């Protein structure tokens, strides 16, 4: 079989049609850009590299070779925060900041180990003259008991009359219960008097 060599122009034209290109410059343009990159693309790459080193949380891992080619113009765009001097408190033209700081540092009792300073102010507890501890004397309790005894005796006598009509055994049982309750009441009264007035307890025989 005979092999016929096609001319170069026909081959280039057919390749351009297959690639969808109309000019030869469009096919050669990517190759030229790969060999001679544009200055704008270089600046964009340099800007991305600097951002990958400056912005925290960037996906790019730190590379020491890239640090050497950092663009130092970024430092001008993002300057470091400068420390501002402390504002001075002035009172009639006199600077009192230094004096206050010295007083706080000298007073060790008002400074903690972590550097937090406090001002100790004496606390005055409010005194209410109307609120006073209630004290009951034993004389007032005795007078109350004396006033209560007559009606109690009257009720006891009436109850005794009613019980006597029912039977002697029931009367004796009721009197015993009344005596036990009376002794219990006297012991309770003696305990209250001892707590309030700190006196010796009443001995009940």
Curated annotation (Swiss-Prot):
- InterPro entries tied to this protein: Corona_nucI, N2-like_embe-CoV
Q: Which UniProt keywords apply?
A: Virion
Q: Is Endoplasmic reticulum set as a keyword in this record?
A: no
Query: Key word DNA-binding present in the record?
Result: no
Instruction: Give the UniProt entry's GO cellular component terms.
Output: virion component
Predominant location category = virion
- Cell location: Virion
Question: Beyond the main fields, what else does the record say?
Answer: The gene encoding this protein is included within the N gene (alternative ORF).
Q: Give the family from UniProt.
A: Belongs to the coronavirus I protein family.
Instruction: Report the function annotation for this chain.
Output: Structural protein that is not essential for the viral replication either in tissue culture or in its natural host.
The identity of this protein, by name, is Protein I
Provenance organism? Human coronavirus HKU1 (isolate N5) (HCoV-HKU1)
């Amino acid at each position: 079989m005979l092999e016929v060599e096609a001319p170069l122009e026909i081959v280039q034209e057919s390749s351009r049609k297959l690639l969808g290109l109309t000019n030869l410059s469009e096919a050669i343009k990517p190759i030229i850009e790969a060999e001679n990159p544009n200055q704008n693309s270089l600046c964009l790459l340099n800007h991305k590299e600097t951002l990958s080193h400056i912005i925290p949380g960037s996906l790019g891992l730190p590379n020491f070779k890239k640090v050497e080619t950092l663009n130092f113009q970024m430092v001008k765009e993002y300057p470091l925060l400068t420390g501002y001097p402390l504002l001075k408190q002035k009172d009639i033209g006199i600077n009192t900041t230094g004096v206050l700081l010295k007083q706080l540092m000298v007073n060790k009792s008002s400074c903690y180990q972590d550097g937090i300073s406090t001002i100790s102010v004496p606390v005055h507890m409010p005194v209410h003259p109307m609120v006073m501890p209630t004290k009951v004397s034993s004389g007032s309790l005795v007078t109350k008991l004396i006033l209560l005894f007559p009606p109690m005796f009257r009720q006891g006598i009436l109850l005794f009359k009613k019980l006597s009509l029912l039977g002697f055994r029931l009367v004796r049982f009721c009197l015993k219960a009344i005596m036990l309750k009376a002794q219990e009441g006297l012991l309770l009264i003696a305990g209250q008097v001892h707590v309030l007035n700190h006196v010796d307890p009443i001995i009940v025989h």
